[in-house]
A protein has these predicted regions:
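Short, basic/glycine-rich phosphate-binding loops at helix/coil junctions
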Residues: 70-78, 130
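Asp-based phosphoryl-transfer active-site loop
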Residues: 15-37
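Histidine/lysine/aspartate-rich catalytic loop segments that bind and position anionic ligands
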Residues: 109-143
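Short catalytic/ligand-binding loop motif for oxyanion handling, primarily in non-cytosolic enzymes
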Residues: 29-33, 114-117, 174-175, 193-195
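Conserved phosphoryl-transfer catalytic core
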Residues: 35-72
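Asp-based, Mg2+/Mn2+-dependent phosphohydrolase catalytic module
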Residues: 2-16, 130-210
Length: 210
């Protein structure tokens, strides 16, 4: 099923559905504390074990050169059932709904694409990658820069950037995406950084509100 321009949202009648949705991770699909309190400490605590077990491999030698060991430590953690990605309870249902409507969903995060795939590949609600059409990281640009969102729009083949809905918890990212022409909503989850009092973006506390 293809979502066509002008198609109405049958659930709430609010107007046309987006062709694509681009999601941030921390504070949007996933609690900020998961990254800060689980992923980062796990990588810190297991770097020695990882290097001892894999030091002779070409991958680890490349990792050391390119400073990307962290993602591979996490990969081992997921494979060994020591890590499990965490998403908010409203996320799986929304992803399934958007997928059924033919809306393509992408992730844009400062974390590497490997780290993104790991989080969504093994979550507290199972493997959610089947609902995701692609992943963007900072190779496309800084998330607070307008050009990054222009690059994403061009990469997705979307001629009208406002056909893309971007969800983030970071005000500066919302400003950049809006300046690039995207539709924007801000995720206002528990524990997220407070927004400026004079901000004018639509805010949501759950994907069920979209």
């Amino acid at each position: 099923m293809v979502v066509k321009e002008g198609m109405n949202n049958s659930d709430n009648g609010t107007g046309p559905l987006p062709r694509c949705i681009v999601l941030d991770i921390e504070g949007t699909t996933t609690p900020i504390i998961f990254v800060a309190d689980v992923l980062f400490p796990y990588a810190h605590d297991n770097v020695g074990r990882h290097l001892s077990a894999t030091y002779e491999t070409a991958e680890t030698h490349d990792d050391i050169k390119l400073l990307r060991t962290q993602g591979h430590i996490w990969r081992t953690g997921y494979e060994n059932n020591e890590l499990e990605g965490v998403v908010y309870g409203d996320v799986p249902e929304a992803l399934e709904k958007w997928h059924a409507l033919g809306i393509k969903v992408y992730i844009y995060s400062s974390g590497s694409r490997l780290a993104q795939r790991l989080i969504f590949g093994k979550t507290n609600y199972g493997d959610l990658r089947k609902y995701l059409s692609g992943f963007f990281d900072t190779k496309v640009g800084n998330k607070k820069e307008i050009r990054s969102y222009i690059e994403i729009s061009e990469s997705l083949g979307v001629n009208k950037p406002f056909d893309i809905l971007f969800l983030t918890d970071v005000f500066q990212e919302a400003v950049a995406a809006k300046a690039a022409g995207l539709e924007v909503m801000i995720s206002n989850r528990p524990g997220n950084t407070p927004l400026p009092d004079d901000q004018s973006f639509k805010t949501i506390t759950s994907f069920a509100e979209i």
